[in-house]
Amino acid sequence: MEEFKDAQKTEELLNEINEDIRKELSEERYKHSVGVMKKAEELAKIYRVNISEAKLVGLAHDIAKEMPKEAKFKYVEEKNIKIDEIEKINIGLLHGKIGADICKKRYDFSTDMQKAIEYHTTGNPNMNMLAKIIFVADKTEEGRSYSNAERQKELEELRQISTIDIDKAVQIAIDESIVYTIQKGGLIHPDGIATRNKLLSEKFVTM
């Protein structure tokens, strides 16, 4: 699919996605998706990424988030989507891959747009700027907040950093996610670690 440049086409597709997620997601998740769309638009303007693509992916990124567990397993099996051992245990991670496949079939999303949806759950060393924007927008959209004062402070700092250095924002978001996952006794996906290490390695090389 060609880059989204036609404003009317973009609005029509945004309306279609909006109608779909209204039906398929809870009100809270729907509001989050709209928030991610707005934050993705903001970051796309800063980093000179196709704004239409950022908005479309931001709105659609969680389209498979609330699919029942059994349905997720059935979907990846029927569509022959490869999943790893951690994804088999932590079913929540599958909504990225499933969402990417849904958006390819329903909305004819480009490969880059699909990858941005797939990678938003764990990160990926091969993320391009669109994927990084969606990853960070998911963590920093204005509707997100924490009752814990320290976590809220970290969120505000991440929002500020995201407008200056998107790579640093991705790395910090992954760091915080790893710490939180360890505290909860959860499994850490290797893609997150690989992404963090790549970003840090690039930073050290340029120092």
Predicted regions and their residues:
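Active-site hotspot residues in diverse enzymes, especially metal/ion-binding acidic/histidine motifs
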Residues: 39
